[in-house]
UniProtKB/Swiss-Prot annotation:
EC number of this enzyme: 5.3.1.9
Annotated pathway: Carbohydrate biosynthesis; gluconeogenesis; Carbohydrate degradation; glycolysis; D-glyceraldehyde 3-phosphate and glycerone phosphate from D-glucose: step 2/4
Catalytic machinery residues: E341, H372, K501
Function per UniProt: Catalyzes the reversible isomerization of glucose-6-phosphate to fructose-6-phosphate.
Catalytic activity: alpha-D-glucose 6-phosphate = beta-D-fructose 6-phosphate
GO biological process, one term: glycolytic process
Any one Gene Ontology molecular-function term assigned to this protein's record: monosaccharide binding
Record-stated family: Belongs to the GPI family.
Claim: ATP-binding is one of the keywords in the record: no
Subcellular location: Cytoplasm
Protein name: Glucose-6-phosphate isomerase
Protein keywords: Cytoplasm, Gluconeogenesis, Glycolysis, Isomerase
Length: 533
């Protein structure tokens, strides 16, 4: 692999100053550097990847063993080596085929849990399961990280399909979050879902206790309006939640990959079991494509290779995710966890420090809002920010089709502007037409130059349906896997979240004045004195 990395870097240095626009002298450039899966189009032609770079990147994926590790993942081998676990979130959307874990087929158990979820969601949506004040009108999902970001993102994304109770999400331990969520709800018609695998997550259980106190005095049996997504049956029972409303999942489903199963219960309640199954089917379709398509036509592999080129080869430290769909407003936050928690590592699987940078910083906002915020830096700043646009051909509001067309035109305009830029001569000509002359023209013209040559990709699709969202999310999941394999890291642990948790537990009694601050640095002691009780 070392020779391929070196060849990629040498080639990148050779073409670094070549305008991307020059590559379009090839009339087949767009076609050759775009990939389709049914009605989904991934256009990566507006990058500086040429035929040589593409071939080297594909060789890199082969040398890294992407095929073998992909097959090992789907076969249920313990590719999460630091925790000794299989990685089988894909099984949650492929329950009609054997799923082997340590030689045992667990598919029947997955189907049973899924059927229980369907029955519960159906009964709640149809008014057969009620609150103590009548039909359930609101569902509050209490979780954090993977128990929140996925379903919260998906519920907003699929709002046009949400014909069930209103769904709300509480994650932050900041009391303002749960206060503002519950203040306008009726406890007698609200179901609270507590999503915590161990039922010990501090933020989640603190909010769950607050929600229970909110119900006490207003309903006769608060626990009767709680459900849980957890494997800790003893703790959910101690909380008072009946076993019929407890939905478990296995340790081979990582939190940030878990909304395909019981963590997605709130989504199933919102959009209904049929549309939830369409969401699963979309993910399964991407799984099949990932397993069967050759690398040169494989969307997750190509998306990952573009990411490797931009981050590890070109040195661009960030990646902007720019969905031109307001209902995908939470997608960048979801991908922040998916990508940065998975591939934000400093050591390889063998424990040695990485020779290359690991995953990029992922951020973004929906268009067109971002155009009036941070696109200034993307267009004219001194750092290159690779951009990933997502856009649908059609919206869900036929009477507002003219606005959707304006949205699409803005998306395409931004990718073209990043590619082309505006030269100094073009800026001068524009100012001259406005009557600006002399030194003032020269001064102002320089402020109107766009360097261009900024790389971007576009993922285009007909409409954001449940099945299409499933495809998109599975695409990004597999992209993370491929990048992790190429970098030689474990994408499925998250030890980086542990140290802060441990320190927070020790700091709480210091803030309460019950423990001394010996051993703390001067800054932390000062902050404890200022913020403590």
């Amino acid at each position: 692999m070392k020779q391929i990395w070196q060849a990629l870097k040498a080639h990148q240095q050779a073409v670094e100053h070549r305008p991307i626009l020059d590559l379009f002298a090839d009339p087949r450039r767009a076609e050759s550097f775009s990939t389709r899966l049914d009605d989904m189009l991934f256009d990566w032609s507006k990058t500086n990847i040429d035929h040589t770079a593409r071939d080297l990147l594909i060789d890199l994926a082969g040398a890294a063993g992407v095929s073998q590790k992909r097959d090992a993942m789907f076969a249920g081998r313990k590719i999460n080596e630091t925790e000794g676990r299989a990685v089988l979130h894909t099984a949650l959307r492929n329950m009609d085929r054997p799923v082997l874990v340590e030689g045992q087929d667990v598919a029947a158990g997955l189907r049973e849990t899924h059927a229980r979820m369907q029955a519960f969601a159906h009964d709640l949506r149809e008014g057969l399961f009620t609150g103590q004040g009548g039909r359930i009108t609101d569902v509050v999902n209490i979780g954090i990280g993977g128990s929140d970001l996925g379903p919260a993102m998906a519920c907003l994304a699929l709002a046009p399909y949400a014909d069930g109770p209103r769904c709300h999400f509480v994650s932050n331990v900041d009391g303002a979050h749960i206060h503002d969520t519950l203040k306008d709800l009726d406890p007698a018609t609200t179901l609270v879902i507590v999503a915590s695998k161990t039922f010990t997550t501090i933020e989640t259980m603190t909010n769950a206790e607050t929600a229970r106190r909110w119900m006490e005095g207003r309903v006769a049996n608060p626990a009767a309006q709680f459900a849980a997504v957890s494997t800790a049956a003893d703790r959910t029972a101690a909380f008072g939640i009946d076993a019929s409303r407890v939905f478990g999942f296995e340790d081979w489903v990582g939190g940030r990959y878990s909304m395909w199963g019981p963590i997605g219960l709130s989504l199933m309640i919102a959009i209904g079991p049929e549309d939830f199954d369409a969401f699963l089917s979309g993910g399964a379709a991407m799984d099949r494509h990932f397993r069967e398509a050759p690398f040169a036509e494989n969307l997750p592999v190509l998306l990952a290779l573009v990411g490797i080129w931009h981050n590890q080869i070109c040195g661009h430290a960030t990646r902007a995710v720019l969905p031109y769909d307001q209902r995908l407003a939470r997608l960048p936050a979801y991908l922040q966890q998916l990508e940065m928690e998975s591939n934000g590592k400093r050591v390889a699987m063998d424990g040695h420090e990485l020779a290359l940078h690991s995953g990029p910083i992922v951020w973004g906002e929906p268009g067109t809002n971002g155009q009036h915020a941070f696109y200034q830096l993307i267009h004219q700043g001194t750092r290159v920010v690779p951009c990933e646009f997502l856009v649908a051909r059609d919206g869900h509001e036929p009477d507002l089709a003219h606005q959707h067309l304006l949205l699409v035109s803005n998306c395409l305009a931004q990718s073209e502007a990043l590619l082309r830029g505006r030269s100094l001569d073009e800026a001068r000509a524009i100012l001259a037409k406005k009557g600006v002359t002399g030194t003032e023209l020269e001064r102002q013209a320089r402020h109107r130059v766009f360097p261009g040559n900024r790389p971007s990709t576009t993922l285009a699709y007909p409409k954001l349906t449940p099945a299409m969202l499933g495809r998109i999310i599975a695409l990004y999941e597999h992209r993370v896997f491929v990048e992790g394999v190429i970098l030689g890291i474990n994408s499925y642990d998250q030890w980086g979240v542990e140290l802060g948790k441990e320190l927070a537990i020790a700091l709480q009694p210091m803030l309460e004045g019950r423990a001394g601050t010996e051993g703390k640095d001067g800054s932390t002691r000062q902050l404890i004195d200022f913020l403590g009780r």
